[in-house]
Every structure is written in structure tokens, then in C-alpha cells.
Amino acid sequence: DRQTDRQSLIKLLQYVFGYAVVKLSDIATITRGGNFQKKDFCEEGVPCIHYGQIYTYYGTSASKTITMITQTAADKSKFAEPNDIIMAVTSENIEDVCKCVAWTGKNKIAVSGHTAILHHNQNAKYLSYYFHTSMFFSQKQKYAHGTKVIEVTPDKLNDVIIPLPSIAEQNRIVDILNRFDILCNDIVDGLPAEIEQRQKQYEYYRDKLLSF
């Protein structure tokens, strides 16, 4: 079928050129998150990620959640599967809209509203790192709308362009960025200027690794 032909073409381009330039819709199915609220949080229940936590707590990936919701709320919720990307699609500013986290836990989790869930079969951390680059930033600026509340709809996300190397190359890039990420974020002591410089170096090399 058409989708199988598209996947075969992507693999051929990856083999010949080392990567393929694809639309997000070529490699991912995008759905909206659920509708639970903070009042549904509880001590023991179903693990969840609320869209506000993507801005304030989570980094590029997570294997555990910091909150749970009641079973009643979960029964009406939407879920992210292991390896999915959870993206916050509304924000008060352009910098935070489309901030995302790769879910690397072993079980599915409930996801709140104001999110998009990206289901795919790529390296989730590779995609998450890409969604933090300046290349993606320029694209989301084009697709974002609103003034007080900025939004990028799942339909618009389908048109986002991504450079996609083979899974083996994605894994290699992720391994490098993971080590760089740890190096930057594990600094306990040091002058603020040094930490800021290290962060700039990390962002520079991340963008270089993810541009083809």
C-alpha cells in the first residue's frame, strides 16, 4: 500500500544518502491528549503526565512520572505508550510551546489535555532532541497561532520536516547527546558563567548533530 511504499522509499534514501528528509506524518501518528485536571491527582493510582509538568519538570525524556490520577479519571483519559512523544501544544509564549518529553517507561501513562501524543517506531530520544533544536523552533514559529495563548495544532505538526537517519545512526547521535546532557546537568559547583558557556556548547553541538 501507499504507506508501505513510503517507508520503503525512506529506507532507500537512508541507505543511499545516510538520511531522509521526511514529514512528521510520514513516521508518526499524532493524536490529542485527554482531559484530566490537577484535581484528579491522587497518592496511589494511574501514572500520568500533566501538560504543565512538561514545561516545569521534565527534560527530553522520562521513565517515571511524578503524579498519578484516580482510576475514574484514567478511564476517561488518553494514554501514551512506551516510546511515544508527549508534546505540550499550548503555551503563553513561543519558547515553551511544543516542548516535549519522550516517554521511555515500560507501561502506558495517562496524558492530559493541551498535548499531542506522537506514536512512532523511531528512537524517541532522537525525535525529542530534534524538537529542542533551532531548526524545529523556526518551523513551530511558522505554524503557531494566537496572542495570549500560543498553540500549534496536531494538524500543523503533521507538516513538520525532520532529517531522519537510520535507527543505528539515531542511536549513535542519542548516545553522544545523552553524555553531553549529563555533563551539562550534573554540574553541582561552578560559576554561573561556566555553566552558561557549557549549556551554549551543548546546544551548538546538539544542533550540529541533528542537521544534515
What do the PLM-derived regions correspond to, one by one?
Residues 1-9, 18-20, 158-199:
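Amphipathic alpha-helical segments
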Residues 19-24, 46, 80, 84-86, ...:
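Short, structured motif recognition centered on aromatic/hydrophobic residues
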Residues 26-37, 52-84:
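Sequence-specific dsDNA recognition surfaces
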Residues 50, 75-132:
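A short beta-sheet element
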Residues 15-18, 35-36, 73-74, 104, ...:
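Short, solvent-exposed loop/turn positions at domain surfaces
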